[in-house]
Amino acid sequence: MSAYRQPVERYWWARRRSYLRFMLREISCIFVAWFVLYLVLVLRAVGAGGNSYQRFLDFSANPVVVVLNVVALSFLLLHAVTWFGSAPRAMVIQVRGRRVPARAVLAGHYAAWLVVSVIVAWMVLS
């Protein structure tokens, strides 16, 4: 005789905001992988020379790729924001025996993100 298993709907997680947000964050890993692959393809095209890079630019101009990159960027931002949001709970930092407030840890992460983004933008655009 087997134990009773209550039937569960397929999209049970979509009814509660916290579960939906968790699932979207987990799905965002697919788009993080896409961006890594895209970066590798860019580097390969640049390394192969001008013609290869032009073919890559033509591929990147395809509307499907543009839409995919916009969706991936939105998921990447969700991934980063939720990652930073969990940092104050995961990192217990103490200074002089007192715990650093969660807002300070969060502000530090966002400040570092901003600095790195400015440096990368400066390197790419200059």
Swiss-Prot record:
Signal peptide bounds: none
Protein origin, superkingdom: Bacteria
GO molecular function, one term: succinate dehydrogenase activity
Transmembrane residue ranges: 30-50, 64-84, 105-125
Stored InterPro entries: Fumarate_red_C, SQR/QFR_C/D
GO cellular component, one term: fumarate reductase complex
Membrane topology type: Multi-pass membrane protein
Keyword vocabulary terms for this entry: Cell membrane, Membrane, Transmembrane, Transmembrane helix
Annotated compartments: Cell membrane
Role summary: Anchors the catalytic components of the fumarate reductase complex to the cell membrane, binds quinones.
Family: Belongs to the FrdC family.
Quaternary structure (record): Part of an enzyme complex containing four subunits: a flavoprotein (FrdA), an iron-sulfur protein (FrdB), and two hydrophobic anchor proteins (FrdC and FrdD).
Designated name of the protein: Fumarate reductase subunit C
Organism of derivation: Mycobacterium tuberculosis (strain CDC 1551 / Oshkosh)
